[in-house]
Amino acid sequence: MKRVRFAPSPTGYLHLGNARTALFNYLFSRHENATFILRIEDTDLERSKKEYEEMLMEDLKWMGIEWDEGPDAGGPHGPYRQSERLEIYMKYVDKLLKSGDAYYCYCTEEELEQEREKAIAEGRPYRYSGKCRNLTPEERAFYEGKSIKPVIRFKVPDKTVVFEDIIRGHVEIDTKEFGDFVIVRQDGMPVYNFVVVIDDALMGITHVIRGEDHLSNTPKQIVIYEALGFAIPQFAHLPIILGEDRTKLSKRHGAVSVRALKDDGFISEAVFNYLSLLGWHPKEEKEILSKEEIIKQFRIEDVNKSPAIFDRTKLRWMNGVYIREILDLDDLTKRAIPFFEGFGYKADYEFYKKVMSAIRDSIETLMEIKERAKVFFVDEFPYTEEIVNEVKSDENVYKVVEIFYNKIKNLSAITKEDFKNITKEIQKEYGYKGKALFHPIRIALTGEPSGVGLDLLVEVIGIERVKFRLERFLEYFG
């Protein structure tokens, strides 16, 4: 049985790079009928926070990513938080110490700094000298007597580590490049490269799918697998995600967390769809794909090794397609209501639904509701200096609004058809047409030079509010 995992640290919001890693693990698991595990890497006790863990899970679920085993779901390989697994890790540390594959290192920070400076002066990469590698019992006793808190280092064998990466192909790294590395810090906390091996081995992980920034960690982890006699999983290192300027994706590229995209009014299915295309592409030339279509076509072997480019304009376009064409109106309205309410636009469900029907073709994110929907909710809007000057300089503007008002003032309701018929009457009787007819009505009803169709607007807001806006305009400029 194939088993994969996503193992984030709860030290902040879910970054889009990590979300893409979670997504590709999820897609692999569903395509391969494998088990998907969520594991929380919270050994950084200072930075890890419970609220970040909760938000992380919320954001994954919002995206449509579900897991089979995890802190909330349970499972046969728990606990699924590293902070709850310390006893397990120390058992394997003891095993390595007893087998001679690990040792206590008493070197001070000053000594290590001198080693680093010497390496720099000699123009070579730094690796630990191995000073404490073969201490005698007497030497150890001497250091213990000085109350020096040791770290524990892994005794790295002198060899070339070779593995076949599913995405990157053949990889060879000489262990001379990194030397004996720390597996337990002075405070007694085991480090990432050690605990990740123990967790992956005991949880039966068969495929490790993660970002290429972990590529340099892989040989260190492989030598630990070998020392403990664990089966080595297959590795797949995903390409880095860059901004449009070809630098590493960061806050200066705008919203780069799932939470920020959600708050900015992006649709979860659009985010799922877009992130799936960062480094992978279906065989067919089609970009709008349902979750089921993506799962069916996704193969980890097809992931590209060159960097993926995060194109916000394309994400907005794709989000707009979901708003305009894919979500049904009721579903879209339910998702939009928190945005309406957040902007102070209060109404009942049916009114929200009518507004969404009117504006969905002109927005790319739900955040744009603030501006696009304003004309449906705000009756007392300011007249800009431009409008004031226009009305003063062209008497026809006021005249057209007055004619239109006289045509509708006795109506008890108004529909799109009524609006079209009335404007046709005005054209016929007074000769006003095109911009000369519709522009004055628009600025009287909205205070804007362009926007939503006027026939739609009058039908949605209703006759009383149409009269109120026209009367307000006529009184202001009369």
UniProtKB/Swiss-Prot annotation:
Query: At which positions is motif 'KMSKS' region?
Result: 248-252
Sorted alphabetically, the Gene Ontology cellular component annotations on this record are: cytosol
The record ties this protein, via HAMAP family, to: Glu_tRNA_synth_type1 (MF_00022)
In terms of Gene3D superfamilies, this protein maps to: 1.10.10.350, Glutamate-tRNA synthetase, class I, anticodon-binding domain 1, HUPs
Record keywords: Aminoacyl-tRNA synthetase, ATP-binding, Cytoplasm, Ligase, Nucleotide-binding, Protein biosynthesis
* Keyword flag Oxidoreductase: no
Name under which the protein is recorded: Glutamate--tRNA ligase
State the similarity comment: Belongs to the class-I aminoacyl-tRNA synthetase family. Glutamate--tRNA ligase type 1 subfamily.
| PROSITE patterns linked | AA_TRNA_LIGASE_I
Residues annotated to bind ATP: 251
